[in-house]
Amino acid sequence: MIPGIKRLTRDFPQVNLAFSLHSPFEKQRSELMPINQTYPLHKVMDALDAHVANTKRRLFLAYIMLGGINDSAEHAKALAHLILSRGALSYLYHVDLIPYNVTDKTARKFIASNNETIKNFSDILHSNRISVATRMQFGSDIGAGCGQLYADERD
């Protein structure tokens, strides 16, 4: 992942980069995304900082809102701190809040955050001057929506 970010920065600086974050906490992110054990968030953030510094392009942080898991005020405040700690270029970080889309193949341990929780999360980011948007839910009826954490296995 980090070598890919560096390669993208070097070879395709005009391309906007989106990074799947889903938790500002290392331990929880490792539980949600095992790749975090190989590429810890703090090291990935260093690579993303270098990308932003070199390209001066907005970087998108995708954040799937999982009810009762990563949608608390504590998570929002930690995410704001993570972005603000980027320093002078923190204004180039943008958060896309993505409502979790449940399908017949997604993990049953996850549920979607409710709209009020998503709004409160967004408001905390806004109050910290973090650029944030909440994505609309499209495509979940056909298994094509953002916010679906699963792999379709075929025989």
Model-derived regions, located:
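Conserved AdoMet/S-adenosylmethionine-binding subsite of the radical SAM
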Residues: 1-124, 128
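Conserved beta-strand termini and adjacent loop/short-helix elements that scaffold enzyme active sites
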Residues: 98, 135-137
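Radical SAM enzyme core and accessory elements
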Residues: 127, 139-155
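Residue-level detector of anion-binding/catalytic polar loops
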Residues: 131
